[in-house]
Amino acid sequence: MTAGSAQAAPVKAVTKAGETSLQTEINRLINVERTSRGCAALKTDAKLTTAARGHSAWMAQTGTFSHTGRSNSNFVARSKAAGYAKPSAENIAWGYRTAKQVVDGWMKSPGHRTNILNCKSTTVGVGAVFSANGTPYYTQDFGY
């Protein structure tokens, strides 16, 4: 599923530590959404995070916003290439400046919301990567 973008605002260069902090906050916020609706909190999975960060980095490097990635890969292929056997869904977004904005955007979109609130999913990996011009790209990969 894809989400649109918020209005772009000028940003300073973001470090990998800043991206990691953003990813952690997105994970926290989606777990608030899930647990408030009766689903278990998702566990962060390093393999799904690798797949998600890789796809976000590719989108940021190429300026492409798509579920289809490098070499026509999809989220299943990327997750399996990272060593995760049972991927369940993917959300992407771009342009949002805060974790709250991106999670709010996903929650307002029926398809993204369904992915986040799928109680059968047990794990998640989030990749937040900023392009050279400061545009953030997000990938959220879920697994069983």
Model features per residue range: what roles?
Residues 74-144:
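A well-ordered secondary-structure block
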Residues 18-76, 120, 124, 131:
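Short, well-ordered surface patches within globular domains
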Residues 11, 27, 116:
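Alpha-helical and His/Cys-centered functional microenvironments
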Residues 1-8:
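Secretory targeting and sorting signals
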